[in-house]
């Protein structure tokens, strides 16, 4: 075939725009700022004024559920339902949509429908879930923009459970779809499916990962690295579910409850299975794993490689899973696909389970290595026995654990939508008290600002405390933020980064102002400490602007309340302790990732853009908000004055920078002519002069005419962080 040539120039046509060698190929360690600009409006097909929450409120949820119930038993020839019921398939789909969540960074989960996109749509653990989503398409098509894919997948899981006799805890809508893969999520560094280079030492799993192998949701059901060691599997199960925010009881309830339904698929060798959806040919239209084993579907389906059902009635909620688990002794065998699994030693069990497609066939139940850990593990075992002997307790535990699994990344209850939102407040929702008092008005705000500035607290102290309170927010799972004032509670009050001794002094002063104001009111008007902390930051920034000769009035909206210690789950907040915060020039110990990468990661969690990250860091440096009041990056002779000095001095070619150690974590900036020490800075500071994109942004704020823009942009970005968790303002 002749090469195509341009009809104008006669030159050979090359790869279309976007192909070829990329910057990342030349410089693989280049700082990735793209994660700060995901899900641009340019890639969103919805109208600019589209409001998903308002559309969902118009949805007839009962009608959608009726259609889902009907779908459960409407078996399609192109993908027949096991036992004539799609319920188990939809449970797995919903579970695997939600099960990517990990507590450490709040990323993953069911909140944005990313199971539709790579890599999740092609993970080995998600084999054949492409069919589940395709079965849902007619319902999604029918209700359109009123229900997102993210909500529909979770709702389908709930309806599947309900259609098989289980009473769920509730359902909340409000998950808005994204339109592209989430590139900010670190799934591991392995270059092949099921790789496990994520471990070191005595099976220490790399943070923030939760799954044991690349492409798995939780654990390898055959056992660690495919080796059928039951007790070792129990260790993996415990660690993985803990990293996904589940305790031991929730873990047992979820596994036992989920495996009450359906079966595994390993009818033949995996060599018959074709490529995953992202690698499948065009004519497959987004489907993958096409099998050449006999019919390739129904009783010939190949999925995980394990074959069989866990209990006699796979489409009915009952105690069959736990009863079967403890009733038999188990022999290790291999499935027709060659996967390790366990079958009862008792020959009488051989015909206790019906076939999924042929009523004339019967089978023995099976268990995976991970299943047996629920019996043999010294902690899981007693819990599983108690659940077996107390069906109502088990049902309640599974209902609550399933609700937590599928709603964990949605944030506070104020984001929940729909008529099936449970009334009970759960501690993992990070509850805050409702506003039960009159809010402060504009005059009160002005008076309180004056008292804050007259309190003896410095600009630096007020700014640092407000930032420490608000910057815990994570856009990933909508946790953290200034609302609740949890900075005064365990564990946040004791975090190293918050400088506990100084923090205690600041909080004592703020609480004094709060008490004085509240006790002087004749009505119900009050100011919360959460509001006062943010207001203190605003007052300090306004003062810093006045120090620079400018007048600013920062926007402030009261309405935050103060959480109690009883409303704060210490364990789940403890994992949110920053190991690094470049905005405060803080780095705890050594890290495998460069400090500048961790800055970008934190900025992404705060939902900041690259310009917002840039202007915020530059402003915080001159406000002297560093951890420990270090002078690293404080490129100004007038600290606590809101100027663009950080950018001006960083880009000054009169300064020569050199690393002061082999680790290249700290640098000195000396006068090129005299050698005199001018500044010290960290990697986080110097990257704004080194990285070409960040330097371009820094140049904007270093220009002679940029002071007003710098002030406006800093205030805008600051206000964004202060209100990041104010879902009531959206």
Curated annotation (Swiss-Prot):
Cofactor: heme b
Catalytic residues identified in the record: 96 (proton acceptor)
Post-translational modification: Formation of the three residue Trp-Tyr-Met cross-link is important for the catalase, but not the peroxidase activity of the enzyme.
UniProt record, GO biological process: cellular response to hydrogen peroxide; hydrogen peroxide catabolic process
InterPro entries, alphabetized: Catalase_peroxidase (IPR000763), Haem_peroxidase (IPR002016), Haem_peroxidase_sf (IPR010255), Peroxidases_AS (IPR019794), Peroxidases_heam-ligand_BS (IPR019793)
Cofactor: how and how many bound: Binds 1 heme b (iron(II)-protoporphyrin IX) group per dimer.
PROSITE patterns assigned to the protein according to its UniProt record, in alphabetical order: PEROXIDASE_1, PEROXIDASE_2, PEROXIDASE_4
Site label Transition state stabilizer, positions: 92
GO molecular function: catalase activity; heme binding; metal ion binding
Top EC class, one word: oxidoreductase
Lineage top rank: taxon: Bacteria
UniProt binding sites for heme b: 259
Location in chain, cross-link Tryptophyl-tyrosyl-methioninium (Trp-Tyr) (with M-244): 95-218
Chemical reaction(s) catalysed: H2O2 + AH2 = A + 2 H2O; 2 H2O2 = O2 + 2 H2O
Cross-link for Tryptophyl-tyrosyl-methioninium (Tyr-Met) (with W-95), residue positions: 218-244
Record keywords: Heme, Hydrogen peroxide, Iron, Metal-binding, Oxidoreductase, Peroxidase
EC number: 1.11.1.21
One Gene Ontology cellular component: cytosol
Span list, region Disordered: 1-25
Chain's role: Bifunctional enzyme with both catalase and broad-spectrum peroxidase activity.
Family: Belongs to the peroxidase family. Peroxidase/catalase subfamily.
UniProt name for this protein: Catalase-peroxidase
């Amino acid at each position: 075939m002749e090469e195509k040539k341009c009809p104008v120039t006669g030159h050979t046509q090359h790869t279309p725009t976007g192909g070829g060698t990329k910057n990342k190929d030349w410089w693989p360690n280049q700082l990735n700022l793209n994660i700060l600009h995901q899900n641009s409006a340019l890639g969103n097909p919805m109208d600019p004024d589209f409001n998903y929450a308002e559309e969902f409120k118009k949805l007839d949820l009962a009608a959608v559920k009726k259609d889902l119930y009907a779908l459960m038993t409407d078996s399609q020839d192109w993908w027949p339902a096991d036992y004539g019921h799609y319920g188990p398939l939809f449970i797995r789909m919903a579970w695997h949509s939600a099960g990517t969540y990990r507590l450490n960074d709040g990323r993953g989960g069911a909140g944005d429908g990313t199971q539709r996109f790579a890599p999740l749509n092609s993970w080995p653990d998600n084999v054949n879930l492409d069919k589940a989503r395709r079965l849902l398409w007619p319902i999604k098509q029918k209700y359109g923009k009123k229900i997102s894919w993210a909500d529909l997948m979770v709702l389908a899981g709930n309806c599947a459970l309900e259609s098989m006799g289980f009473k769920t805890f509730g359902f909340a809508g409000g998950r808005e779809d994204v339109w592209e893969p989430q590139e900010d999520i670190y799934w591991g560094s392995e270059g092949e499916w099921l790789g496990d280079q994520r471990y070191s030492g005595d099976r220490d799993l790399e943070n923030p990962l939760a799954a044991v192998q690349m492409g798995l949701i939780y654990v390898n059901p055959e056992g660690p690295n495919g080796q059928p060691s039951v007790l070792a599997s129990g260790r993996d199960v415990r660690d993985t579910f803990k990293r996904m925010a589940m305790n031991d009881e929730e873990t047992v309830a979820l596994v036992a409850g989920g495996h009450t339904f359906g079966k595994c698929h390993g009818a033949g060798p995996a060599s018959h299975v074709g490529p995953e959806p992202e690698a499948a040919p065009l004519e497959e239209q987004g489907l993958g794993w096409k099998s050449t084993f006999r019919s390739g579907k129904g009783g010939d389906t190949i999925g995980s490689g394990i074959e069989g059902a866990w209990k006699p009635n796979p489409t009915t909620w009952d105690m069959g899973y736990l009863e079967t688990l403890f009733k038999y002794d188990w022999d290790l065998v291999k499935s027709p696909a060659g996967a390790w699994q366990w079958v009862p030693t008792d020959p009488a069990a051989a015909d206790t389970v019906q076939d999924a497609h042929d009523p004339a066939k019967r089978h023995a139940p099976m268990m995976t290595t991970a299943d047996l850990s629920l019996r043999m593990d010294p902690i899981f075992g007693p819990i599983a026995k108690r659940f077996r002997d107390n069906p109502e307790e088990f049902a309640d535990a599974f209902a609550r654990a399933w609700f937590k699994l599928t709603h964990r990344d949605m944030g506070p209850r104020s984001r929940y939508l729909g008529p099936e939102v449970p009334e009970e407040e759960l501690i993992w929702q990070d509850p805050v008290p409702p506003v039960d008092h009159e809010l402060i008005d504009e005059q009160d705000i002005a008076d309180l600002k004056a008292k804050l500035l007259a309190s003896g607290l410095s600009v630096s102290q007020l700014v640092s405390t407000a930032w420490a309170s608000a910057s815990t927010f994570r856009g990933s799972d909508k946790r953290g933020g200034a609302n609740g004032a949890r900075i005064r509670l365990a564990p946040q009050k004791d975090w190293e980064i918050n400088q506990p001794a100084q923090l205690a002094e600041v909080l004592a002063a703020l609480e004094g102002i709060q008490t004085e104001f509240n006790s002087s009111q004749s009505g119900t008007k009050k100011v919360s400490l959460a509001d006062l902390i943010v207001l203190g930051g605003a007052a300090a920034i306004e003062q810093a602007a006045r120090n620079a000769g400018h007048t600013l009035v920062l926007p402030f909206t009261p309405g935050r309340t103060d959480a109690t210690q009883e409303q704060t789950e210490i364990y789940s907040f403890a994992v949110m302790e920053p190991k690094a915060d470049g905005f405060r020039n803080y780095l705890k110990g050594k890290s495998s990732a460069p400090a500048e990468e961790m800055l970008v990661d934190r900025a992404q969690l705060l939902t900041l853009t690259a310009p917002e990250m840039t202007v915020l860091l530059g402003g915080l440096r001159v406000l002297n908000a560093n951890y420990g009041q270090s002078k690293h990056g404080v490129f100004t002779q007038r600290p606590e004055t809101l100027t663009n000095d950080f950018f001006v001095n960083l880009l000054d070619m009169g300064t020569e920078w050199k690393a002061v150690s082999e680790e290249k974590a700290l640098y000195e900036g000396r006068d090129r002519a005299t050698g005199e020490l001018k500044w010290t800075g960290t990697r986080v500071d110097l990257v704004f002069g080194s990285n070409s994109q960040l330097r371009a942004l820094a140049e904007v704020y270093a220009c002679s005419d940029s002071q007003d823009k710098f002030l406006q942009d800093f205030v805008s970005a600051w206000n964004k962080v202060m209100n990041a968790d104010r879902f009531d303002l959206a």
